[in-house]
Amino acid sequence: LLFRNVAIALVAAGFIFTGSASPAKAWNCVQFVHQVSAVKLSGDAWRWWSAALGRYERGKQPERKAVLVFDHTSRMVHGHVAIVADLVNKRIIQIDHANWSIGRFGRGQIARNVRVQDVSEKNDWTSVEVWNELDQCWGRPYKALGFIYAR
C-alpha cells in the first residue's frame, strides 16, 4: 500500500510540474520550439536567424506563433529561442520557452506566458527584457535578432 501511494504521488508530481501525467522532461529551448512550432530549424538558437533566410519570413515585429530569436552572449553561448504566445501591447508580449532559468523546478523546464518587453530605443525589438516570476522583476536586457514567422 505504501509503494502504491508513493507511486501515485510521483505521477501526480509529474502532472503538476509538466501539465501531463508523464514525468517531467528536461528540454532545451531549441528542442521545445522545434516540437511546438511550425518553424523547423535546428542547431544553436542564435543561428536560427541566418538559417531562416530563404526558408521563412523574418521581421522585427512580434506575431502570435512567431519564433523570437535571442542573440548569443558570453553567458548564453547558444542564444535562445521562444514562441510568441500572445501580444499584450506594442511593447510587451508573452512567450512560451524552455530552459531559461533554473527556477524552482530545475533546468530544462517549460515556462508558459512569460512576459517579455521591448526596451530598444527605436521600438524595434532589438533589445528585450524577460520577466522573472520568482523575483517579480524584469531581467537584464538581451539582444534580440528578430522574429521568424512560420509562413
Where are these regions (language model features)?
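Bacterial N-terminal signal peptides that target proteins for export
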Residues: 1-10
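C-terminal segment of classical bacterial N-terminal signal peptides
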Residues: 14-23
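Secreted/periplasmic proteins that engage bacterial cell-wall peptidoglycan
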Residues: 24-88
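Aromatic- and glycine-rich peptidoglycan recognition patches
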Residues: 89-151
